[in-house]
């Protein structure tokens, strides 16, 4: 296994321009494929998850042209649901942003599709979504364990009418239904949410992209979603993929801990995990908001006790910032960490203990109490890109840190460590 030793960083300063958002990129690609007309996507993320979506779209008969640097993609929309004459086997890696929405979208058309991926994908639940789709006429069969991929979709279309979606496990279940809803007939559904909807900013991302594609969806405090009738997905022409607010969190955290960093490609009107900056501000960092940037500057940091369900990705970075804060930090209402690309709660708890950090928690929270002195540790990333990136911040202390399998950042941010080095000054 490859590893990367990061030597202590004395200070960070500078500006980082963000790559496109993974969540936005894959949603936009799927909608562009289904839309009437041609869509030009710019600032597309070039990463493993996006490559899996593009490969799937190719197998589904979608034509597109990718620029040499893979950040611009012109997609020729089908203007209809997917239809194939022979069975198609789609390998989706560990990309939940491809697996869940594609599962629903494929049910709208015709043909037989096998959806599978890496071993971890077989541990990521999809049963709530499949159950809802089955109530609307979907024919889906599990190939191994009930409730989990791999699975086979025998597509024959979906019925309309009201549906109840469990929002407590993953917002991607709701996203999948929202993206499929305009094509459901004869009655466009109302979507009722069971439980407390997790990761609401990611639903805002879905609603924004669908609105750009001609589909207006309204909601009642995230409890009931209304899709107006007589709407169809149409190309927006040009669509700019916004920077990844979750990726911004590492650089904003670095500025809050030891210097001053400006991140461009997102701003005060952005959606997604930008509320991470609000948490940094509550911890004592100085935050400046612009239309197209967010800047974080070092301040005396103190621990917080907060519900961070709305920022599930960036909350991991808060666990790393907590190592530099005065007093304990409690990150609450994060049960859905356990059903991400890896069991994030287990991974975070295991790795912070290696650093000499006092940690406690259960299925729903983690509390981190920093020691007087961190210890050098080899951080196991569990093939999880965000674990690699958030633990890189340990180098902002006076000890080095070793990141095992640093290449796992290719899922969302292939050149992350180069970008970190560009704003870092060695001790």
From Swiss-Prot:
<feature type="binding site">
    <location>
        <position position="172"/>
    </location>
    <ligand>
        <name>3-phosphoshikimate</name>
    </ligand>
</feature>
<feature type="active site" description="Proton acceptor">
    <location>
        <position position="313"/>
    </location>
</feature>
<feature type="binding site">
    <location>
        <position position="22"/>
    </location>
    <ligand>
        <name>phosphoenolpyruvate</name>
    </ligand>
</feature>
<feature type="binding site">
    <location>
        <position position="124"/>
    </location>
    <ligand>
        <name>phosphoenolpyruvate</name>
    </ligand>
</feature>
<keyword id="KW-0963">Cytoplasm</keyword>
<feature type="binding site">
    <location>
        <position position="313"/>
    </location>
    <ligand>
        <name>3-phosphoshikimate</name>
    </ligand>
</feature>
<protein>
    <recommendedName>
        <fullName>3-phosphoshikimate 1-carboxyvinyltransferase</fullName>
        <ecNumber>2.5.1.19</ecNumber>
    </recommendedName>
</protein>
<feature type="binding site">
    <location>
        <position position="199"/>
    </location>
    <ligand>
        <name>3-phosphoshikimate</name>
    </ligand>
</feature>
<feature type="binding site">
    <location>
        <position position="411"/>
    </location>
    <ligand>
        <name>phosphoenolpyruvate</name>
    </ligand>
</feature>
<dbReference type="GO" id="GO:0009423">
    <property type="term" value="P:chorismate biosynthetic process"/>
</dbReference>
<comment type="pathway">
    <text>Metabolic intermediate biosynthesis; chorismate biosynthesis; chorismate from D-erythrose 4-phosphate and phosphoenolpyruvate: step 6/7.</text>
</comment>
<feature type="binding site">
    <location>
        <position position="27"/>
    </location>
    <ligand>
        <name>3-phosphoshikimate</name>
    </ligand>
</feature>
<comment type="similarity">
    <text>Belongs to the EPSP synthase family.</text>
</comment>
<keyword id="KW-0808">Transferase</keyword>
<feature type="binding site">
    <location>
        <position position="170"/>
    </location>
    <ligand>
        <name>3-phosphoshikimate</name>
    </ligand>
</feature>
<feature type="binding site">
    <location>
        <position position="340"/>
    </location>
    <ligand>
        <name>3-phosphoshikimate</name>
    </ligand>
</feature>
<dbReference type="InterPro" id="IPR013792">
    <property type="entry name" value="RNA3'P_cycl/enolpyr_Trfase_a/b"/>
</dbReference>
<feature type="binding site">
    <location>
        <position position="22"/>
    </location>
    <ligand>
        <name>3-phosphoshikimate</name>
    </ligand>
</feature>
<dbReference type="InterPro" id="IPR036968">
    <property type="entry name" value="Enolpyruvate_Tfrase_sf"/>
</dbReference>
<dbReference type="InterPro" id="IPR006264">
    <property type="entry name" value="EPSP_synthase"/>
</dbReference>
<dbReference type="GO" id="GO:0008652">
    <property type="term" value="P:amino acid biosynthetic process"/>
</dbReference>
<feature type="binding site">
    <location>
        <position position="96"/>
    </location>
    <ligand>
        <name>phosphoenolpyruvate</name>
    </ligand>
</feature>
<feature type="binding site">
    <location>
        <position position="336"/>
    </location>
    <ligand>
        <name>3-phosphoshikimate</name>
    </ligand>
</feature>
<dbReference type="InterPro" id="IPR023193">
    <property type="entry name" value="EPSP_synthase_CS"/>
</dbReference>
<feature type="binding site">
    <location>
        <position position="344"/>
    </location>
    <ligand>
        <name>phosphoenolpyruvate</name>
    </ligand>
</feature>
<feature type="binding site">
    <location>
        <position position="171"/>
    </location>
    <ligand>
        <name>3-phosphoshikimate</name>
    </ligand>
</feature>
<dbReference type="InterPro" id="IPR001986">
    <property type="entry name" value="Enolpyruvate_Tfrase_dom"/>
</dbReference>
<feature type="binding site">
    <location>
        <position position="172"/>
    </location>
    <ligand>
        <name>phosphoenolpyruvate</name>
    </ligand>
</feature>
<dbReference type="GO" id="GO:0003866">
    <property type="term" value="F:3-phosphoshikimate 1-carboxyvinyltransferase activity"/>
</dbReference>
<feature type="binding site">
    <location>
        <position position="23"/>
    </location>
    <ligand>
        <name>3-phosphoshikimate</name>
    </ligand>
</feature>
<keyword id="KW-0057">Aromatic amino acid biosynthesis</keyword>
<feature type="binding site">
    <location>
        <position position="386"/>
    </location>
    <ligand>
        <name>phosphoenolpyruvate</name>
    </ligand>
</feature>
<comment type="subunit">
    <text>Monomer.</text>
</comment>
<comment type="function">
    <text>Catalyzes the transfer of the enolpyruvyl moiety of phosphoenolpyruvate (PEP) to the 5-hydroxyl of shikimate-3-phosphate (S3P) to produce enolpyruvyl shikimate-3-phosphate and inorganic phosphate.</text>
</comment>
<dbReference type="GO" id="GO:0009073">
    <property type="term" value="P:aromatic amino acid family biosynthetic process"/>
</dbReference>
<dbReference type="GO" id="GO:0005737">
    <property type="term" value="C:cytoplasm"/>
</dbReference>
<dbReference type="Pfam" id="PF00275">
    <property type="entry name" value="EPSP_synthase"/>
</dbReference>
<keyword id="KW-0028">Amino-acid biosynthesis</keyword>
């Amino acid at each position: 296994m490859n590893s990367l030793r990061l030597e202590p960083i004395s200070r960070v300063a500078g500006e980082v321009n963000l790559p496109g958002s993974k969540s936005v990129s894959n949603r936009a690609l799927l909608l562009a494929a289904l839309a009437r007309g041609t869509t030009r996507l710019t600032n597309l993320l070039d990463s493993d998850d996006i490559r899996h979506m593009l490969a799937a779209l190719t197998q589904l008969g979608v034509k597109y042209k990718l620029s040499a640097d893979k950040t611009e993609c012109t997609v020729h929309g089908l203007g209809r649901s997917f239809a194939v004459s022979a069975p198609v086997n789609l390998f989706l890696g560990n990309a939940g942003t491809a697996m869940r929405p594609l599962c629903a979208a494929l049910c709208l058309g015709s043909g037989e599709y096998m959806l599978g991926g890496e071993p971890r994908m077989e541990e990521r639940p999809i049963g709530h979504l499949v159950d809802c789709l089955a109530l609307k006429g979907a024919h889906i069969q599990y190939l191994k364990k009930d409730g989990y991929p791999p699975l086979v979709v025998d597509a024959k279309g979906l019925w309309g009418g009201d549906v109840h979606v469990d929002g407590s496990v993953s917002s991607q279940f709701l996203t999948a239904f929202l993206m499929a809803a305009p094509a459901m007939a004869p009655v466009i559904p109302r979507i009722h949410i069971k439980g407390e909807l997790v990761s609401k900013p990611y639903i805002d991302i879905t609603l924004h992209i669908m609105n750009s594609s001609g589909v207006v969806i309204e909601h009642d405090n995230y409890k009931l979603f209304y899709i107006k009738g007589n709407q169809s997905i149409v190309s927006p022409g040009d669509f700019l993929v916004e920077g990844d607010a979750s990726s911004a969190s590492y650089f904003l955290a670095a500025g809050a801990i030891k210097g001053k960093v400006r991140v461009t490609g997102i701003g005060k009107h952005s959606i997604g995990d930008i509320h991470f900056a609000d948490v940094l501000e509550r911890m004592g960092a100085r935050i400046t908001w612009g239309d197209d940037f967010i800047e974080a500057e070092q301040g005396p940091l103190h621990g917080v006790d907060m519900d961070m369900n709305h920022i599930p990705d960036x909350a991991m970075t808060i666990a790393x910032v907590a190592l530099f804060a005065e007093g304990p930090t409690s990150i609450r209402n994060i049960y859905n960490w356990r059903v991400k690309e890896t069991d994030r709660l287990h991974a975070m708890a295991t790795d912070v203990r290696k650093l000499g950090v006092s940690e406690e928690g259960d299925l729903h929270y983690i509390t981190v109490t920093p020691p007087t002195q961190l210890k050098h540790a080899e951080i196991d990333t569990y093939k999880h890109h965000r674990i690699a990136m958030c633990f890189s911040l340990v180098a902002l202390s006076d000890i080095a840190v070793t990141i095992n399998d640093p290449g796992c950042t290719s899922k969302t941010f292939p050149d992350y460590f180069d970008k970190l080095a560009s704003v870092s000054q060695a001790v």
